[in-house]
UniProtKB/Swiss-Prot annotation:
Gene that specifies this protein: Trmu
Region span, Interaction with tRNA: 171-173, 358-359
Organism: Rattus norvegicus (Rat)
Keywords: ATP-binding, Disulfide bond, Mitochondrion, Nucleotide-binding, RNA-binding, Transferase, tRNA processing, tRNA-binding
Coiled coil stretches, renumbered: none
Protein name: Mitochondrial tRNA-specific 2-thiouridylase 1
GO MF, one example: tRNA binding
Stretch list, region Interaction with target base in tRNA: 96-98
Domain of life: Eukaryota
Length: 441
């Protein structure tokens, strides 16, 4: 029966998705490979990286003897992912476009295309993750529309699928999948969930997939790649074409000629004595916890707060300065994957779990407090370094990824508390990373 199952596999032109398609083929499924083009630009040598990736994906399909399709979501990526990315940066937040891309593009646009246009019984990707469903259970799933209300009727989905961490904990990518919908997850297979990266490479080497095995692992912004972010945001521009803006052939309603973000020069100021240490091109380019490159200073200084009103970036010496540490945050309405929200959290209004706000960082024990609007307060058992507005707090209970929420408010830093400024109020939802620095955006 499994031989009749049609699985559409997303191919990126990399080794992980190639091996995912190979493993599906070995299971006897009818496999179709699809390459998504979501960004269109030339690299420094004038070569379009997306075209090279597309060629590599096509070659994978030739080797595996499976059909190949290409789809473009350039317009959707711009509207749903990149525009939000720019807006978040302008507000002084630290966005994660990889999480947004999975939510809006890979597990929405592509997912619907695979099911509605290609007749897929299931969709697959090369992510290192697992779900609580076996393959045959995935094929039996029916479409269930997500509820419009705040909380899902608990009888609506009797056996919700859970998102589980991969066997290879170092490569686990559930962090990036924490906003994926229940409906998409129910129809998804992750062939690499039980494998290590080394074993995946071994499979590729043994099956004539050398052209993807030799490629460097993709890093940086989803579909855009690893770039100098300051140069990318401030210098790259697009032009008016025939009276309307075209981005890779897709019309975009924006100013005819522009830079992504305009430079806004400001000062680096020491949080300890208010000394001006140097200047920068824009306060929004900096994330709490990162090292600030200040001309003329050899010793390291780190970003601890940002003042969007004045355009100043407050910095502190030492990588472990107390101004870098906080133990309290509030998210927007949390996207819960299996239960919305977890029964224990509804019952007790509080729940112990773990969270992380960066991929591959150690999980942090915390206590969640549920608010009536679906947002949560997150109290870390121990203060953590580098919390920033705009990041996603991703929650875990054992091996299960529960979901995530965007960080919109932060509690005072350990430095503020130590100085006796023990203000219990938390920063409003603004483009600042500490209380009281900015007016509301």
């Amino acid at each position: 029966m499994s031989a009749l199952r049609h699985v559409v596999c997303a191919l990126s032109g990399g080794v992980d998705s190639a091996v995912a398609a190979l493993l599906l083929r070995r299971r006897g499924y009818q496999v179709t490979g699809v390459f998504m083009k979501n960004w269109d630009s030339l690299d420094e040598q004038g070569i379009c990286a997306a075209d090279k990736d597309c060629e590599d994906a096509y070659k994978v399909c030739q080797i595996l003897d499976i059909p190949f399709h290409q789809v473009s979501y350039v317009k959707e990526y711009w509207n749903d992912v990149f525009s939000d990315f720019l807006n978040e940066y302008e507000k002084g937040r630290t966005p994660n476009p990889d999480i947004s891309c999975n939510k809006h593009i890979k597990f929405s646009c592509f997912h619907h295309y695979a099911v509605d246009n290609l007749g897929a019984d299931a969709v697959a990707t090369g992510h290192y993750a697992r779900t609580s469903l076996e393959d045959e259970e995935v094929f039996e799933q029916k479409h269930t529309k997500r509820p419009d209300g705040l909380f899902r009727n608990r009888f609506e989905v009797r056996n919700p699928v859970k998102l589980l961490q991969a066997a290879d904990s170092f490569k686990d990518q559930t962090f990036f999948l924490s906003q994926v919908s229940q409906d998409a997850l129910r129809r998804t297979i992750f062939p690499l969930g039980e494998l290590t990266k080394d074993f995946v490479k071994k499979i590729a080497a043994e099956n004539r997939l050398h052209h993807v095995l030799q490629k460097k692992e993709s890093m940086g912004i989803c579909f855009i790649g690893k770039r100098n972010l300051e140069h990318f945001l401030l210098q790259v521009s697009v032009s008016d074409v025939s009276g309307g803006l075209l981005w890779a052939g897709a019309p975009v309603v924006m100013k005819p000629v522009f830079q992504y973000l305009q430079p806004r020069p400001g000062k680096f100021i020491s949080i300890e004595d208010n000394r001006v240490l140097g200047t920068h091109k824009g306060w929004f380019l900096y994330t709490l916890g990162q090292r600030a490159k200040i001309s003329g200073l050899s010793e390291p200084w780190y970003v601890v707060e940002k003042d969007g009103t004045k355009g100043d970036v407050l910095v502190a010496p030492r990588v472990d300065h107390p101004a870098l540490y906080r133990d309290l945050l509030r998210t927007n309405r949390v996207h819960w994957i299996a239960e919305e929200p977890p029964a224990a959290l509804v019952r007790d209004k509080m729940m112990e779990c773990h969270f992380r706000f960066r991929h591959q960082m150690a999980l942090v024990p915390c206590v969640l407090t549920l608010n009536q609007d679906g947002t949560v307060w997150v109290t870390a058992v121990k203060a953590v370094r580098g919390l920033a507005l705009g990041q996603f707090a991703v929650f875990y209970k054992g091996e299960e990824c529960l979901g995530s929420g965007k960080i919109l408010r932060l509690g005072p830093s350990a430095y503020t508390l130590q100085k006796g400024k023990n203000r219990t109020r938390v920063a409003p939802e603004v483009s600042s990373d500490s209380p009281g620095l900015h007016p509301t955006s």
